[in-house]
Amino acid sequence: MKGNVIVTPDFKRDVKKLLKKYPSLKSDLARLAADLFLNPKMGTQLSAHVYKIRLAIKSKGKGKSGGARVISYVDILTIEESDVYLLTIYDKSEFENISDKKLKELIQRIEDDLSDI
């Protein structure tokens, strides 16, 4: 399955903060985007379309377990193609997990946007 990777405004805002702390994050995210293109459903499935991806931040030097978490939403278009929306990113050392409330808000926003298309 192949997919397109689409960055949401929430993700842009969150990644901007982390880029100031971790200079390698830009290249780490480029590798993630390439991986998502080939395997849109990577990570731990949180709900029908939502996945949590563990991302190692090279400049942080702690591997995947101490890196960042990326929340993605996979919109399946055909059997062979899907769009992957990057909803948010957070530093594992700042937040253990994303709250259910915030996750529901992010999912609702993307589903509202998709229904408008």
How would you describe each model-predicted region?
Residues 1-29:
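Arg/Lys-rich, positively charged N-terminal/basic patches that mediate binding to nucleic acids
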Residues 5, 23-26, 47, 65, ...:
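Non-catalytic, surface-exposed connector residues within folded enzymatic/regulatory domains
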Residues 24-42:
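Compact soluble domain cores
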Residues 42-87:
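Basic/aromatic recognition patch in beta-strand/loop cores that engages polyanionic ligands
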Residues 74-117:
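Enriched for short, Lys/Arg-rich terminal
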